Swiss-Prot record:
It comes from the Eukaryota. It is a multi-pass membrane protein. It catalyses: L-valine(in) = L-valine(out); L-leucine(in) = L-leucine(out). Keywords: Amino-acid transport, Membrane, Mitochondrion, Repeat, Transmembrane, Transmembrane helix, Transport. The lineage of its organism: Eukaryota, Metazoa, Chordata, Craniata, Vertebrata. One of its GO terms (cellular component) is mitochondrial membrane. The chain crosses the membrane at residues 20-42, 71-90, 113-133, 185-201, 222-239, 278-296. GO terms for molecular function: branched-chain amino acid transmembrane transporter activity. This is Solute carrier family 25 member 44. One of its GO terms (biological process) is amino acid transport. Induction: Induction by cold exposure in brown adipose tissues. The gene is SLC25A44. It comes from Homo sapiens (Human). Mitochondrial solute transporter which transports branched-chain amino acid (BCAA; valine, leucine and isoleucine) into mitochondria in brown adipose tissue (BAT). BAT is involved in BCAA catabolism and actively utilizes BCAA in the mitochondria for thermogenesis. Its main location: mitochondrion.
């Protein structure tokens, strides 16, 4: 009898790399389009002082939609799409690191922990400059600014974000901070995303394994993998949200010290300030994680070398 708890993990050496990258870029773009509005909302909630403008995720969604229309929810999106590069670097580093660690440990938890942290280190080194620019674009609202910089608006004062205004933000960052400005908050990003990634993968495999005990033998593995993803994302989000709030403020407000930013946040808003944007983060993470997990597992299945297709149970 087959052990239903034996979830077969497709490793790097099992993949057709050409298929893996082509399908991967398409899948990542679809995910970005679907969850970007909540990424923007989370950023604004984390930066605003108290509840000066928005009273929560739903309130922010309605106000942005009324004020700026659907395009207001996609400010900075074109710039943000360049993170597709870091996304591919992330999965490549993750899979290669798992393969490397497998020579020293067969523990799936150890492989996931080390690979997740390493992948995030590589990805954040590419992502941070893109994030800095896109976050400043996210903070523009009808010609008003919530961050340090303000782009030029059109004659009607709508402040529509275009490539010219992206260049304007880049110019202002260079003038204010030089090239170092594009890596503002780099350490804070590493302190946010390395633990987030290192925690997510082990919890994902842990939840999937536990759910496999509860599911009938006939239940496809992809079902409890799809449930495990959001559970792992919620767990990681709760654990790392305080650092994510600090990271966002450092990058958008031009802070130079993580510790001083933390102290200021605590003085202004108390411990609850560290949980700002958590609901938006979980809301955006839940559907995206389901798509990522189902998509990533399906992507790996589609990218299997032909001779291995029949050897995998789903």
């Amino acid at each position: 009898m087959e052990d239903k708890r034996n979830i077969q993990i497709i490793e790097w050496e099992h993949l057709d790399k050409k298929k893996f990258y082509v399908f991967g870029v398409a899948m990542t773009m679809m995910i970005r389009v679907s969850v970007y509005p909540f990424t923007l909302i989370r950023t604004r909630l984390q930066v605003q002082k108290g509840k000066s403008l928005y009273h929560g995720t739903f309130d922010a969604f309605i106000k942005i939609l009324r004020a700026d229309g659907i395009t207001g929810l996609y400010r900075g999106f074109l710039v943000n799409t360049f993170t597709l590069i870091s996304g591919q670097c992330y999965v490549t580093t993750y899979e290669l690191t798992r393969k490397f660690v497998a020579d020293y440990s067969q523990s799936n938890t150890v492989k996931s922990l080390v690979a997740g942290g390493s992948a995030s280190l590589v990805a954040q080194s590419i992502t941070v400059p893109i994030d800095v620019v896109s976050q400043h674009l996210m903070m523009q609202r009808k010609g008003e600014k919530m961050g340090r910089f303000q782009v030029r608006g059109n004659p009607e004062g709508q402040g529509v974000v275009a490539f010219g205004q992206t260049k304007d933000i880049i110019r202002q960052i260079l003038q204010a901070d030089g090239l170092r400005g594009f890596y503002r908050g780099y350490v804070a990003s590493l302190l946010t995303y390395i633990p987030n990634s290192a925690v997510w993968w082990p919890f994902y495999h842990f939840y999937a394994e536990q759910l496999s005990y509860l599911c009938p033998k006939e239940c496809p593995h992809i079902v409890f993998q799809a449930v495990s993803g959001p559970l792992a994302a919620a767990t990681a989000s709760i654990l790392t949200n305080p650092m994510d709030v600090i990271r966002t403020r450092v990058q958008v407000e031009g802070k130079n010290s993580i510790i001083l930013t933390f102290r200021q946040l605590m003085a202004e808003e108390g411990p609850w300030g560290l949980m700002k944007g958590l609901s938006a983060r979980i809301i955006s993470a839940t559907p995206s994680t389901i798509v990522i997990v189902v998509g990533y597992e399906s992507l790996k299945k589609l990218s299997l070398r032909p001779e291995l297709v029949d050897s995998r149970h789903w």
